[in-house]
């Protein structure tokens, strides 16, 4: 049993979403009205054709039109021309509105995505965001445009044809208005069952495809564990269910046309009988009856569209709600009135704590670290000890849940977010490059090619040991490097990311496992580039390979989100604590 309160709440929510969509149409109101007028012309033309046929049969053959051979053809041609122009105009104008709204919504979604906080990307996969911004919004507008056309054009068509029917024969129209809804109800029952069977069949087809995908993808496990019989049994069950659903669909689909034809014949028989009775009393003519039947048949299609509108309308509004949910995502807090031209780089972590969610264990707890300007501090510790979480707090990808972080004596929350991030360069093992030129990747953040300082790009490439590599590319610094730098080797991609950090020339540098995925030769080149980059910068280094951070000014060892120990490489080895244990394990392995 349905819940009336819940249904009312859902309906109210749909109205709210609909009103918000209408808000996007307000700037296009003039074009919108013009499109409605064009659709009204198309709808009115539906009622003209039965009238022309009526007059042709009653007056055209030996009647008052006999000497005017051009009359009916001229009317038909004129109606077709006007209808065609109006149809094109309505389609073009609605497409114009739809594409303008599409552009506006896409830009709003992309803007909100770019300015969303880091936890937004933890909740949403890249695939779901791509689907929403590129495909879902397009589908929503396509569905809602189609629904709008149905609501306006088909409603006006129904009105125009009903006016003609009442004008021609009001008695017969009243009888038809009783018969047609009954036929429509019976047909909707058949179609509803067919749609339900189609949905279930599609779900089963997807399940069967998944069984095939699993068996094909896991063929080694299937063969090694003798799972052929089990997989055959799984697939046989699915195939049998598919066969049964296909037969039920064949029955429902097969009944559809003959039942429709029978009901239409029954309705037509009733109408013909009544029309013949009327004809005997000179209440109708051949032309009037033919025009009436034609108008009645023309009425069926728009009525069917209007009765079927609820499903696509609901689907469109539901999808629109998901789009608005993305548009309404909160943006990163931009608070902070402190302005920094260029920071010295003095970083202080005061009793910093962080949790990823309410009720979860602390990822960081009571972190107290002072990093003087220009010092290199390495963060080491077992996986899950909080190293990456700690460095993610510096550019405010997340905000501490306890304590605070200071930059040059200012709490980072008091510094304008853009200015804070201008002070930080980041190089990670997960290199992110863009499908653009070498120069555009090095100078990433420049709004146009004119803003790129090419001399500075060349210096950055030289410092990253990439000058010779770039010279050998087809178009030098103007060579497109492909999706995520696929045209470059792993070491070259990493050095290009370092060149980007060098170009930015920020006073604070964060290195997150920057050499962990490289071979020995690439690591040597990248390490040399990193050493050049670290000179004069406050640097936080995360490293699993302890050999790469032995020369750090200080090493901080984290364990379970707390500082376990800190000191130089030699001091920590002498202390024989966690760091010394990790060091022994690594070098024993090597």
Swiss-Prot record:
It is a multi-pass membrane protein. SMART domains: AAA. One of its GO terms (cellular component) is plasma membrane. Residues 33-315 form the ABC transmembrane type-1 domain. It is an enzyme of class 7 (translocase). Its main location: membrane. Keywords: ATP-binding, Cell inner membrane, Cell membrane, Lipid transport, Membrane, Nucleotide-binding, Translocase, Transmembrane, Transmembrane helix, Transport. Residues 347-585 form the ABC transporter domain. It is found in: Cell inner membrane. InterPro entries: AAA+_ATPase, ABC1_TM_dom, ABC1_TM_sf, ABC_transporter-like_ATP-bd, ABC_transporter-like_CS, ABC_transpr_lipidA, P-loop_NTPase, Type_1_exporter. GO terms for molecular function: ABC-type oligopeptide transporter activity; ATP binding; ATP hydrolysis activity; ATPase-coupled lipid transmembrane transporter activity. Involved in lipopolysaccharide (LPS) biosynthesis. Translocates lipid A-core from the inner to the outer leaflet of the inner membrane. Transmembrane domains (TMD) form a pore in the inner membrane and the ATP-binding domain (NBD) is responsible for energy generation. Homodimer. Belongs to the ABC transporter superfamily. Lipid exporter (TC 3.A.1.106) family. NCBIfam families: MsbA_lipidA. In MsbA the ATP-binding domain (NBD) and the transmembrane domain (TMD) are fused. This is ATP-dependent lipid A-core flippase. It comes from Cupriavidus pinatubonensis (strain JMP 134 / LMG 1197) (Cupriavidus necator (strain JMP 134)). The gene is msbA.
């Amino acid at each position: 049993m349905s819940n009336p309160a819940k249904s009312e709440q859902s309906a109210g929510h749909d109205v709210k979403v609909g009103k918000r969509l209408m808000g996007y149409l307000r700037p296009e109101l003039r074009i919108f009205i013009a499109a409605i007028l064009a659709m009204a012309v198309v709808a009115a033309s539906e009622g003209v054709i039965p009238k022309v046929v009526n007059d042709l049969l009653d007056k055209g053959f030996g009647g008052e039109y006999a000497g005017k051979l051009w009359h009916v053809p001229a009317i038909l041609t004129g109606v077709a021309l006007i209808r065609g122009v109006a149809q094109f105009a309505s389609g073009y104008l609605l497409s114009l509105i739809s594409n303008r709204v599409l552009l506006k919504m896409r830009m709003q979604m992309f803007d909100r995505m770019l300015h969303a906080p880091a936890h937004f990307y933890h909740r949403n996969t890249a695939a779901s965001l791509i689907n929403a911004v590129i495909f879902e919004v397009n589908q929503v507008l396509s569905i809602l445009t189609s629904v709008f056309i149905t609501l306006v054009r088909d409603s006006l068509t129904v009105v125009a044809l009903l006016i003609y029917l009442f004008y021609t024969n009001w008695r017969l129209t009243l009888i038809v208005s009783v018969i047609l809804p009954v036929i429509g109800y019976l047909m909707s029952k058949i179609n509803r069952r067919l749609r339900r069977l189609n949905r279930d069949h599609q779900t089963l087809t997807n399940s069967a495809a998944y069984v095939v995908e699993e068996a094909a993808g896991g063929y080694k496990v299937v063969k090694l564990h003798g799972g052929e019989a089990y997989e055959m049994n799984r697939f046989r069950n699915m195939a049998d269910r598919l066969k049964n659903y296909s037969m039920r669909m064949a029955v429902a689909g097969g009944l559809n046309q003959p039942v429709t034809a029978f009901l239409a014949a029954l309705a037509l028989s009733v109408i013909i009988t009544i029309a013949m009775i009327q004809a005997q009393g000179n209440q109708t003519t051949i032309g009037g009856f033919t025009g009436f039947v034609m108008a009645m048949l023309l009425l069926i299609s728009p009525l069917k569209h209007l009765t079927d509108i609820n499903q696509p309308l609901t689907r469109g509004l539901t999808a629109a709600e998901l789009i608005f949910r993305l548009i309404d995502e909160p943006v990163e807090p931009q608070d902070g009135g402190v302005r920094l031209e260029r920071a010295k780089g003095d970083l202080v972590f005061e009793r910093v704590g962080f949790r990823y969610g309410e009720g979860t264990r602390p990822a960081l707890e009571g972190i107290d670290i002072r990093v003087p300007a220009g010092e290199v501090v390495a963060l080491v510790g077992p996986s899950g000890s909080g190293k990456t979480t700690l460095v993610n707090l510096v550019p405010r990808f997340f905000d501490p849940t306890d304590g605070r972080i200071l930059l040059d004596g200012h709490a980072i929350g008091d510094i304008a977010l853009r200015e804070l991030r201008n002070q930080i360069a980041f190089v990670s093992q997960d290199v992110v490059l863009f499908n653009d030129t070498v120069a555009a990747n090095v100078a990433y953040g420049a709004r146009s090619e004119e803003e790129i300082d090419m001399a500075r790009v060349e210096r950055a490439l030289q410092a990253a040991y990439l000058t010779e590599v770039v010279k050998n590319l087809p178009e030098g610094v103007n060579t497109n490097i492909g999706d995520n730098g696929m045209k470059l080797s792993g070491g070259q991609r990493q050095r290009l990311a370092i060149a980007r950090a060098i170009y930015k020339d920020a006073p604070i540098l964060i290195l997150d496992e920057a050499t962990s995925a490289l071979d020995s030769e690439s690591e040597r080149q990248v390490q040399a580039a990193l050493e050049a980059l670290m000179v004069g910068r406050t640097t936080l280094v995360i490293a699993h390979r302890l050999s790469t951070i032995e020369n750090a000014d200080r090493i901080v060892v984290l364990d379970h989100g707390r500082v376990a120990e800190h000191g130089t490489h030699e001091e920590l080895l002498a202390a024989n604590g966690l760091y010394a244990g990790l060091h022994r394990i690594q070098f024993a392995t090597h």
